[in-house]
Amino acid sequence: MKKITICLMIFFTTLTVFSQNNEIGVFVGGANYIGDVGPTTYIHPFSYNISTNAVAGIIFRKNLNERIALRAKFNYAKIGSSDNWPKTAEYRKQRGKYFKNSINELNLGVDFNFLDFDIYSSSLQMTPYISSGISLFRYDLLRYESGVAKANKYGDATDLSFPITIGYKIKPLNSFIIAFEINANYSNSDNLDGSYPGQKQMASSDYFGSTLSKDWYVFSGITFTYLFGNKKCYCAN
């Protein structure tokens, strides 16, 4: 993953040097997970415990025109859930499992603005948008030892996830953009929660839940970005 990150940094640095219409900034918010442990609320920032369900990251965006932009984003998140939390199904409460995990995610995607969003205009700009792409993420491998309620780490792994983002952004000042977005990620893992560890661990572990669907993680938050690069030049013929 380190080599991929370096290559992407070189690519976007080159893109920035020879072009314009760039944004760079930060993303902060809450995270929640959807899987085989705890409640199944789809969007629930901070999920009862801010210390284990938060996300922060950096974002780079290249605006191709008023409707389309490319994005690269790196996030670090903590996720967790418990069968003892409110709104959990009764059969899960009787089981009493809980876990914590961490995610390092690199995302590449394309944004589509529903309205024209002119980054050069001095007037207020705003638009809803959607985004999708692909993410590479690293997470802790977890398992539940037989008869133990808390998941324990036994390694780490790298996998893919497929994000769908909806958001709303505003440009209140010439060089700053604020966006509110919800980013739902369908992961290629069924073990973010420790419910389905590797074959070697299953003999000495409690495993449970459905293998028909993978785990999801959701980031909900705010981005603050700064516009940089040369403005359009309207030259006389």
Predicted regions and their residues:
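Residues that define the transmembrane beta-barrel architecture of outer-membrane proteins
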Residues: 20, 50-54, 102-106, 126, ...
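Predominantly the C-terminal beta-signal and adjacent terminal strand-loop region
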Residues: 171-237
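Gram-negative (and chloroplast) outer-membrane scaffold detector with strong preference
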Residues: 62, 66-144, 228
